[in-house]
Every structure is written in C-alpha cells, then in structure tokens.
C-alpha cells in the first residue's frame, strides 16, 4: 500500500487582513502561500498534479477514485463483478475549523466516503484504521498519520 502524507503550513494568532491577487484559477496571497478556490476546474488541476493523466487512483486510506467522478457520490465502476463507488472530492488535511486553510498544501484528493468519515476532525476512524492529523515537529506543517 502506498501512503501519501500531505503537509500544511498554517498560522495561529489574530486574524490579519490579507490582500490577495488572483492569477488564473489560483489565488496567491502576499505572505507566500497559495490559496485555491475549491471548484471542479481546480480539483481536476490538483488531481493532475498528484496523479498525472491517470483515470484511477487510491486515496490515503486505499479507497478507489475515478477522475471522472469528481463531486459525484453515486459514481461507481464494476470491478470483479462488484460495484465500487469511486466519486471523489477535496479533503482539508487540517480542517478549516481547526485552523486549516485552502492552501494547496492542505488539500488532498479523497474518495467521498473517506472524506465523509474524516469530517472536520483531526482524529478519526475509517473502517478499522485510526488516523490523526499531527504537526511535524519544529514546523507549522501537518500530515495525516495512520496510528494503528
């Protein structure tokens, strides 16, 4: 099984006004982070960055995703005579409610089931696997760790 750990940079503290400049579909803020509006076009760009032209990929839990199934929770394929739901969407590694952002480094493609199970928690079970979002020691970055 291939496990992809994503990292995110974030900042706690008081809110500051941010003046953003829009370049194409991505929004870049003056602090150096790049924020991504979550929409189909940007989701497909993110897919291409991580998976290239592949039609199918697995998320961090191993659930199947199909490029054509973005945003469709009823999208499925048949594999070995079994219906497999492979719709996908964008998951925030560090949830927005916990200080996460829409920076590309905080976003990952996941099967809709995976995203629904993770919700906006930093510790969560998916099937019989326990995951936790943990800060990388000495940095402001975060990653998803499989605990068991």
Model-derived segments and spans:
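Polybasic, low-complexity binding patches
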Residues: 99-105, 116-148
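N-terminal amphipathic/hydrophobic targeting modules at extreme N-termini
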Residues: 2, 7, 17-23
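Histidine-centered nuclease catalytic patch
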Residues: 69-110, 118-122
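Short intrinsically disordered terminal tails
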Residues: 1, 32-33, 147-148
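Residue-level detector of intrinsically disordered terminal segments
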Residues: 5, 34-35
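Residue-identity detector for glycine
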Residues: 13, 24, 32-33
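Short cysteine-rich loop/turn motifs with clustered Cys
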Residues: 37-87, 111
């Amino acid at each position: 099984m291939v496990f992809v750990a994503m990292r995110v940079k974030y900042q706690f503290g008081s809110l500051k006004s941010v003046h953003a400049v829009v370049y194409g579909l991505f929004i870049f803020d003056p602090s150096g982070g790049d924020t991504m509006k979550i929409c189909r076009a940007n989701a497909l760009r993110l897919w291409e960055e991580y998976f290239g032209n592949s039609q199918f990929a697995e998320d961090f839990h191993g659930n199947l995703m199909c490029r054509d199934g973005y945003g469709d929770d009823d999208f499925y394929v048949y594999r070995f005579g079994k219906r497999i739901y492979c719709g996908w969407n964008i998951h925030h590694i560090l949830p927005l409610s916990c200080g996460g952002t829409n920076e590309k480094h905080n976003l990952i493609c996941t099967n809709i089931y995976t995203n629904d199970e993770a919700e906006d928690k930093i510790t969560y079970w998916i099937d019989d696997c326990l995951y936790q979002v943990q800060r990388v020691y000495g940095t402001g970055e975060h990653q998803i760790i499989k605990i068991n």
